[in-house]
Amino acid sequence: MELFNSNRWEGIVRPYSAKDVKRLSGTANIKHTLAEEGSKKLWNMLNNKPYVSALGALTGNQALQQAKAGLDAVYLSGWQVAADANSSDEMYPDQSLYNTESVPTVIKKINNTFIRADQIQTMEGSGAIDYFLPIVADAESGFGGVLNTHELFKHMIEAGASGVHLEDQLSSAKK
């Protein structure tokens, strides 16, 4: 399993084996192309550039403008989603009160915009802009326990997140 053989994970101790992971994975080999390709691109930038330029985006059009401006990545902030882009259509403080599907939904919208822009660019015979910027998304503190966090990460990957960060605090301790 590449996950266990890559030097990317050097120094990481796992209390389980590759065989354990394979046993829990089932037989379907599901690919999440946008997440996989984006994470490779992000990892390459993190290892080969002095910094990765990114701004927060809440809409596909904002992310599209960032790609056109030459930024390296898109950042999707949890507090911005809480305030302006959650699926409850409410304004919340940054306390993980909004629906857990909100961030994956925005990731999907941004990636759908990138896909459309790439299709138009290809149809017009141009290829000057790489619209598939990696999306780094805020998972807050996981919206609950281990299983909640697993489901959130799964949905973020399915939506095409390239990187996810998790706050090192209990949801109940958020200020």
Regions found by a protein language model. Give the residues of each.
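Alpha/beta enzyme core
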Residues: E2-K175
